[in-house]
Amino acid sequence: MKQLLPIGVLALVLAGCGAAPERQTPSDELRDETPEVVAEREWQRRASSGRETEGEALPPVLRDGTLYIADRRGRVSAYKAESGRLVWRFGTGEAVSGGPGVDDDLVVVGTRKGRVRAFESPDGEQRWEARTSGEVLSVPAVGENYVIVRGNDGRVYGFDRDSGSRRWVHDVSVPSLSLRGNGDPLLANGQVMVGFENGRLQALGVDGGELRWDVTVSEPRGSADLDRVRDVDANPVLFGGALYVVGYRGNVMAINPANGQVYWDRELSSHAGLAVDDERTYVTDDRGRIWALDRRTGAAIWRQNDTEGLQPTAPTVHGDRIVFGDNRGRLTVLSAQDGRILARIRVREDVTISEAPVSDGNGVHVLTDDGYLMRYRLRDRNDD
């Protein structure tokens, strides 16, 4: 049985070092300056059943102006991102642990018992069901011909999109001790990119699951099992012709997605994840600090230290700002240019925000672990 790394251990892990201008301000309880950004809540909905046994919300997915939410009790819902209007909701009849993966007319979820279930959108009629050998903790990737599913035991499955028949399986040996959770498979340009608990990122052919290339993101350190944990759990990001990835106790890298060539790499440990814009790569490290790196070289531009210890989510790019949630139920807004804190918004009391906010370019959507989904519009205070 897979063992789980206690969350308290994460606070003891040091991220990679590097020179960068540091932004440091007092905690929100002590700050008395006026925030530079004002957040207006446009709507709020009770979108999911909220915290259950292991606690975290499942990530919301934005597609074509609609937000898709699954909860661990098996409900799947769709909301209009701008208005918050409920478009549809249906029950899967089973505890959901991964998803939803969404395409034009298909919603796919994974379950704790290793089932993959595909439903018609919007009526919720089940199209097919397939089996994997273990719990599904990531979001299935839904493509034109295939649904790609990452199992919790190192296997990656390619299922026929229309029938659910298994076309291929790729098996990777993974260590028994790792972080709980898996990065989502990324489907693009005829291949699927997947990170594993052994510290490697692989690209597989989407038609047959054959290995295209393999890159080491995180190397094992020390002799004790705990010291050798090295998961690649953060979701890879494809941007501007490069693939960006970061590993726990490893590196942040820019990779050529065609052949696995490493453009640049930098020692930096993260399990939360990263985001990318035209100029910079933003990373939440394992101490909770937020970094901005030059997208083309990996050179450090700034680092915000005031978030240390708050378990911030992966960053999300929202125009010229960076937004993320934390374990105090807050949405924090940073300047993308220099990392200064523009605002901290109390979303809800005594809750955690485990999943990164979702931006549609106009509004920022936040899902709390107790199941509340809300949309904020951000504006400069001097626009009043």
Give the ranges of each region predicted by the language model:
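Sec-dependent signal peptide recognition
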Residues: K2-G8
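Short loop/turn segments that connect beta-strands within beta-propeller blades
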Residues: K80-S83, E120-D123, D160-G164, V206-G209, ...
